[in-house]
């Protein structure tokens, strides 16, 4: 992996998203400005960490970061805008929620939303840039908790296990029980379950 070279600036925010692929729930984003004086060991892409490690880092990031913020786009916004534009909107909301304005923003992936400060997309940034790793952890822990809460309301779908992704089990239950109000109606499997597919 090529080592990432930081822009010459002080306040750098990292931004990442979780939940573009699921059929249900919001896409959740986070923006984080880390404190160089309070380093956090073990930051990595949230998908490469155990749940226990993620939860511990989640608390440490919230405690030690100079600023952090969550953003989201709800299922109805995803359906209205499409998932890419909804993700960009959620990222803008996360950056806008920071109580310290960053001088530069690093975004995981290959596209940047329009922001009031310079920004750069970093491919595989969640493994290369600690600020993005921290954002990925905050976003994933938050979204996983939302799926666990939804699982209590709709236990038949298994949301706590698959987090809303289109697993065989989820698709089977979608066909059996239909869609909840939290499902993304613009996504193919949900459309088919609702009989809306053309």
Swiss-Prot record:
GO terms for biological process: DNA replication, removal of RNA primer; mismatch repair. Manganese or magnesium. Binds 1 divalent metal ion per monomer in the absence of substrate. May bind a second metal ion after substrate binding. Keywords: Cytoplasm, Endonuclease, Hydrolase, Manganese, Metal-binding, Nuclease. This is Ribonuclease HII. Belongs to the RNase HII family. A divalent metal cation binds at residues 16-17, 108. The gene is rnhB. Residues 10-198 form the RNase H type-2 domain. It comes from the Bacteria. Its EC number is 3.1.26.4.
